[in-house]
């Protein structure tokens, strides 16, 4: 079973990915991460997904060690989580948009140490050209 964490859990993409992860028997959601000032910090993810409570509490910190972090957050949050992922050898999928050149350089540097997919536009057509 693959352990998954999602950064940006309360956004549209984060919520949708969480729904898909919870429906897949080969995946287990172990961490739900969001901006520290978000109103849902401390709530069980089940409240957000409107499903039975799952025991995954929304936090600002990545407390669990997942196999992969899926990130659809903000540029600053992405870079912060990427440092944690690099230090702990956690594979990362980044779909965050709006990264500046310095932040993109952090992503590039991380790829030297961990598996990292960076695609700020996840549409099939764009990724065939990317």
Where are the regions that the model predicts?
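Extreme N-terminal starter segment of soluble prokaryotic enzymes
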Residues: 1-5
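NAD(P)H cofactor-binding loop motif with strongest signal on the N-terminal glycine-rich segment
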Residues: 9, 73
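N-terminal Rossmann NAD(P)H-binding glycine-rich loop of SDR-like oxidoreductase domains
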Residues: 10, 14-18
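A glycine-biased structural micro-motif
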Residues: 14, 38-42, 55
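NAD(P)-binding Rossmann-fold cofactor-contacting core
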Residues: 23-49
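Short acidic low-complexity segments
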Residues: 52-66
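N-terminal Rossmann-like NAD(P) cofactor-binding module of classical short-chain dehydrogenase/reductase
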Residues: 69-70
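Rossmann-fold NAD(P)-binding glycine/threonine-rich loop
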Residues: 81-88, 95-119, 127-130
